[in-house]
Structures are given as C-alpha cells and as structure tokens.
Amino acid sequence: MKIVHLVPSMESGGVEQVVMELGSGLSSRGVENIVVSGGGRLVPRLEKEGSRHILMPIGKKSISTLFRIGALRALLQAVRPDILHLHSRVPAWAGYLAWKKLPPEDRPGLVTSVHGFYSVNRYSAIMSRGERVIAVSNCIRDYILDHYPSTPPDHIRIIPNAISPDQYHPAYSPSREWLTGWFMSYPELKGKFTLCLPGRITRLKGHLDLIPVVRQLLEQGIPAHAVIVGEAKKGKEEYKNEVLRAIERSGVSQSFTWTGHRQDLREILSTCSVTLSLTKSPEAFGKSTLEALALGKPVAGYAHGGVKEQLDAFLPVSYTHLRAHETLRHL
C-alpha cells in the first residue's frame, strides 16, 4: 500500500499534525507514505517517523499553484500510489486536477479529509469530491451534507482524529528535567491556577474572551494565570498586538504568558490546571482538548462543534449553562 498526502506546508497546525501522525502510524504498519508540501519545521520529524517528504509549493492561493498541476501529474505517474489523500483546499484543487488528467485506469483512489468548517462556496466544494470523504466529527458530516448535498452520504466516513493511549493517559507525568526547565523558563507559573489556551494566534481561537475570565477569577481570589501556546503566522501579527493591548487595558498583563510555538504540548497540557477551547465559531474537532482529557486534565470550552461532542461525554449538563468564570471555579 502506498499513499500520497497533499498538504500546504509542514510548519505547524492541526492539519499538519494529523498528517504527521497518520504517516507515523501507517508507516509502522508497513504502508509507504509520501507527503507533498511546501516544507516546514515538522519535516525532519515527519521523515524520522517513516514518511518520505517531497518539497513542492502547492499551498499558495495564487496562479503559481496551478503551474504545479503538471508536476503533480508526473509525480503520480512515477510513484503510482494506491491512494491520493487531499487535506486542504488549495492542494486539493491542484491534486484533483492532476488526478483527473490521468487515464482512468491509472488513477489512485481519491480521498479527501474535511478538517474544518470551511466557507461555503465552489472553492471549498473540492473537499467534498473525494471518492471517499473523511469527516473528522459528526458535526462535520452534517456540514458536508447540509452545504454540499450532491455528496453521496455513503461516500462519507466519520473518522475522528485520534490520540495514542500510550502517549496520553492519566498516569503520564513530565520528566523532572522537563519540569525544571519549564519553571526556569516561566517562573511566574509556580503556584498558579494555569489556564492553557493552545493553538495558532488567530481571532478564531478567542483570546479576547480569555481576558475577562482571567480578570474575574483574580477578583474571586483565584491565582489565575493564562498560558497561551502558539504563534501568529508571519505577516498576521496585528491580531496578537490587538490582544496584547486589550490585556494591558484590563490590567492583567502580569497574568498572561506567551510561549510561542512549542513541540512539547503534551507536557504543557499535563502541567497546566485546565485546558480551554474558546473558539468563536464551531471547530471541527479540537485535538488539544481531547489530548488534555486523555491526560486526565480538566477541560472547559464553548458548547459547539467537535469540542461539544467531546465535552458532552464528560461535562455534566448543568455546567453548560454557567458563565465561563463560574465553570472554571467549579473545576
């Protein structure tokens, strides 16, 4: 079995993490994985865990990506994969058009994974054109059927993003060396009720909503401290600056720590008091919240999307009607 995955880059983010974990898991089972992307910091780990990486800039929303269709077609003819797996819209268009240009008898099976609630338009419709369409949650399946009704329901498979129970379990604890390094880097976190908000620094993630939560917990005498794990995309730093200004106006700057991109999120989740999901609109799945739950750590999040599906199994119904700071006080 041989699978070619198309993804914009291997820099950071949920889709990239899924591709890396798919590659690692499938490679360990003897499946040959080839990831085509514009590269990034995750490539060395991807290759170390058994996948092959081919550098090809197929993630930019520009005419230049269309010029890669011929190269992708040639790659598919040379590699002859059993499955072509499309993970994101721009690479999906390039990959789909390259796939269509192959003789029907030479085409691999076409799989798309819908990792998010994309804007509803013809551009996003490409993600519903797989011969099999993977939905990462029940709500994503509903989204596909509601907005792209031409998708045959029997083409859709619900396959939630998974975690390894060997890596994420309640008995897990970071090493003494890691803990020493963590508190040396962030001594302000010692003895605090730490609220971890992981993910890219984008408006969608709801950082502004975290400010009143921290302030109100502090007013109640709880030593709350926010730990924001993630970074803004290059050229997209203005939103982070907006959040920093709002934090300063609220007078809680000393209760926020920004770590930037980290490779040790498991250790951070297991060390923080609670993990939050404050996405402004429904999120397809919510990998970090599932990881925190598997580690036995409390999670609080807005009741929508894939995170709601997770929390419905863990959080008493009465809690869903509490305001954010009241819910956290119960935790």
Labelled PLM ranges:
Residues 139, 162:
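Carbohydrate-associated surface elements
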